[in-house]
Amino acid sequence: MSTPANPEDPWARLRQFTRARIAIGRTGHAQKTASILAFGLAHAQARDAVHLALDVAALDVALRDAGLDALHVLHAHGAAADRDQYLRRPDLGRSLDAESRARLVPSPQPYDVVFVIADGLSALAAQRHAVPLLQAVLARLHDWRVGPVVVARQSRVALGDEIGERLCARQVVMLIG
């Protein structure tokens, strides 16, 4: 067993495996200033991320550049009219708006899987990570009947149920921020 870089800090070795705030320490009865400031910054970034809109046009370009446009990309929207309503009324993010219901028509043959890229509470996370993850997963689904990729705004996880039902999908994979 190796000795930690700082023998006074037994947690140093474990911190390399996580960005979580573990064993942040104290000075007297208070937390260290650096950890308080780091938490404040992370909290502000999270609050900003919640209000960011999903850049659907950029996501469409990323899907095309990754060679995934052959899957056919559909756009959907939760029932919330805007981001403020989405945040105040989680129930509206769990169902499609009328226009999206009309756009998502059933397939004559069921799909094995449909992928949904959804903004959730962090559109930035979906924007950054969904396409590479989708590429990696699709590379292993050779014999699967893969349905269209659905890009959904103002979406909660449960929106995948309605999307899967409307598109006749056996499974839905939600890539949600």
Write out the residue ranges for each language-model feature:
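A structural signal for small-residue-enriched, beta-sheet-centric alpha/beta enzyme cores
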Residues: 74-77, 146-176
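Active-site loop/lid in soluble adenylation, ligation, and acyl-transfer enzymes
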Residues: 2-91, 95-98
